[in-house]
């Protein structure tokens, strides 16, 4: 799928992916949205993952916890503003607990990418969360995984 660039507000975090407090980071982003009056019905929750946990030390893994908004304000405190690159992405829809995402990624990188003959793109991939873990049973959580490809 070819995507247009996405304008986001984000908080940059560094630690093991399974130790991130995603909900607290999104709450801080929503506080910024309220303060800056940036409410919009089409907000997307995404995380950009910059590192491979099989290569990078766990305490050095970099993540951007993001809200995609039709208009963004100015950077303020820990909240930054940037563009997630557009381009060609392989998109996978996964339903189930977040704990199983690692196995999904293993399958994508070890089997799907080589079997389909794609090469990885130069930008980081990201996940888009289509429902909320506080209101959804783990087996019903829906995550879209976006892998940049050439």
Predicted regions and their residues:
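A solvent-exposed interaction/effector surface
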Residues: 1-150
